[in-house]
From Swiss-Prot:
It is found in: Cell membrane. Disulfide bonds: none annotated. This is Uncharacterized protein aq_1502. It comes from Aquifex aeolicus (strain VF5). The chain crosses the membrane at residues 15-37, 97-119, 129-151, 158-175, 179-196, 203-225, 304-326, 347-369. Keywords: Cell membrane, Membrane, Transmembrane, Transmembrane helix. It is a multi-pass membrane protein. Pfam families: Wzy_C (PF04932). The keyword 4Fe-4S does not apply. It comes from the Bacteria.
Length: 388
């Protein structure tokens, strides 16, 4: 009988529940968090390359919400403290076994979800998974696409090619531009790592590029017929519409308005010398109680993450996020695939990478962020083990 450690059980439970039920997932996050906090209090030490960033982000989130918007304190705990599961003390043996099963687990989940996604697309006109909406399905299938590509690269089984293209089509069906951007950036980052590792020849590189570019053109043509934002962009490119504020705001889904809202809030904080707000922000969902001069009454000032996060978490929270970005790309860009199992190791870093890119025009927090951080911790554990 296969025996698994407690940490392995938690890893599998978190991954599987992330695709089945957000409530179940959060239950496992809370359980993991309690174990982590107990361990921290007992041993009085934490480790991981993202530690400074997570501490700044989490503490500024909890403090600002407790002080300025206590009504949302529990949300502040969720967005801040839940990220502490990154500090779970993973061991090499635990992660090594998990990393080998992780790709096939994702592949199995991707196939199970497909009937659900296509049924909801047929029934409601939008592809959706078991829980969540088009954003989640876009993220899931960006991850699944990259998984099938890496599995093809390792196993050389051609069944992965049609699956890769099918999953790529689902990303375009989601019409989530942030996820399309995230997929292409992380995919080309993978090509870079493979090339620098001398695992990808010129012919293979250009063949993959041809498939991706062809898929992109097909996806763009489809979205240009179905999505008003792409239609507006095409009209501007073709000279049918002017490049003005109204059209830019339409293309950005109202984010231009929200960007101006956010900048005005920061400007007022500076003018009125609200140093605490500048330091730790106004709390999560600050848009629910703060002014909206441009008519956008959303609960968040969702535009470019630098402005969005500055308002909710201040300069400390923003610095924490920027630190996480820096350390992620530093670790990933320096990674080299020397052995076949290194492909499994690399895949553990992909979810956080996809999230970092897609969050540039939204917010850093996501319901599944604790899992992305923990998977990156697993990546670090195996990466550090390779050092002489």
């Amino acid at each position: 009988m296969l025996k698994m450690s407690r940490n392995e059980v938690l890893l599998y439970a978190l991954v599987i529940s992330a695709f089945l039920s957000i409530s179940l997932f959060e239950g496992f996050v809370i359980l993991t968090l309690l174990l982590v906090l107990y361990k921290i209090l007992k041993e009085r030490k934490i480790k991981g390359s993202l530690t400074p960033g997570i501490l700044l982000y989490s503490l500024s989130t909890v403090l600002s919400t407790a002080i300025f918007y206590p009504k949302r304190f529990l949300k502040g705990i969720e967005e801040g403290l839940f990220q502490f599961i990154y500090f779970l003390n993973l061991k090499k043996e635990e992660v090594k076994g998990f990393s080998k099963i992780f790709p096939k687990l994702l592949l199995g989940i991707s196939l199970i979800l497909l009937p659900v996604v296509f049924y909801k697309f047929y029934k409601y006109g939008e592809p959706k998974p078991i829980w969540g909406g088009t954003f989640e399905v876009g993220f899931f299938y960006a991850l699944f696409s990259i998984t099938t590509f890496l599995l093809f690269f390792k196993e050389r089984r051609f069944i992965y090619i049609p699956l890769f293209l099918l999953f790529l089509a689902v990303i375009f069906l989601s019409a989530r531009r942030s996820m399309m951007l995230a997929f292409f950036v992380i995919f080309y980052l993978i090509l870079f790592v493979l090339f620098k590792s001398k695992k990808l020849g010129k012919l293979a590189f250009w063949s993959v590029n041809f498939l991706i570019i062809l898929s992109f053109i097909g996806g763009y043509v489809y979205l240009s017929q179905k999505d008003h934002r792409f239609k507006t962009l095409n009209d501007i490119i073709l000279g049918k519409k002017e490049l003005n504020y109204q059209n830019l705001n339409s293309i950005s889904s109202g984010r231009l308005n929200l960007l101006l809202e956010g900048i005005s809030i920061i400007k007022e904080d500076i003018e009125n010398k609200r140093f605490i707000n500048l330091l730790i922000g106004h709390g999560v969902r600050a848009g629910e109680y703060m002014p909206h001069r441009y008519g956008m009454t959303q609960h968040r000032y969702e535009s470019i993450f630098i402005v969005s996060e500055f308002i909710e978490r201040g300069i400390l929270g923003l610095l924490g996020i920027l630190y996480i970005y820096f350390m992620y790309f530093k670790k990933v860009l320096s990674f080299r695939i020397k052995r076949e199992e290194d492909i499994y190791t690399y895949l553990l870093s992909v979810p956080l990478g996809l999230h970092l890119i897609q969050s540039v025009f939204t917010f850093f927090w996501d319901a599944l962020l604790p899992l992305y951080l923990l998977l990156f911790k697993a990546f670090e554990t195996l990466q550090d083990e390779r050092k002489p």
